[in-house]
Amino acid sequence: MPIDPTAPYDDDNIFAKILRGEIPSSKVYEDEWAIAFVDINPQAEIHTLVVPKGRYVSWDDFSAQAPDEEIAGFVRAVGKVARAKGLVEPGYRLLANVGENGGQEVPHLHIHLFGGQKLGR
């Protein structure tokens, strides 16, 4: 299903259900701003999804609507997860897909954190 990054937030998306505890996840981190869990279809040795707790469809929605404190808290959470996974020294990749052309599959902002191996160019 194509994701419209300008559409209203859909509370029935899978990440909203994970945030509400309705669907289990392999959680690796949680704070007041974000939750992080292992991707169920990993594309790298380490593939973690970092999801803000706020109701944001995409990076565009988040960057335009979230308060500065929430943006900072989420960005710091991404960094904390990378450090906890031991990814800083060997290196890692961050990815946020936005909309249909960007390959977004879930209408809730999330960052893919890839690592644990040499990643392609």
Predicted features, each with a name:
Residues 1-121:
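HIT superfamily nucleotide-processing domains
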